[in-house]
Amino acid sequence: TGSTNRSWSVSCAMNAQGGYGYLNIVDFILQSCCDVEKNLQELYRRVAFNICIGNSDDHFRNHGFLLTPRGWTLSPAYDMNPSLNEYQSLLINESSNKADIRTLLESCESYMIKKEVAENIIRQVLAAVAGWENLAVLLQIPAREVTMFKDRFKLNL
């Protein structure tokens, strides 16, 4: 048809390279993306959000990149759903996939992010997630589901 594929799934490269964690995505950003600092911070923000809501469906196929006129950049986030799982699909650092915001903060340098910036990103995510219960009521989420996730969200806040 003459159209070209202008998107890239992390799973494409990781299947070939045998990758298994967020730091593999960091490597791709460092090697291939425009706006490296912006993309690294956005990835870090997404990892923090995934941890806070218990999104354990964070495998490589749920991370992608778009080819823009300036180069590769993270695609908009997608398929982010809360769960009661305490572990991520991907490793947060070199050795742990435990959904622990402290582990992420301690690993900020592996994401090429200064501690002050990492703390600020985490504060922003925590503030965004803190209002989840009011939003759930507004969206008419069944009370039993709100109750089910209450402890999960408290665990990470």
Report the location of each language-model feature.
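Anionic ligand-binding catalytic core segments
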Residues: T1-L157
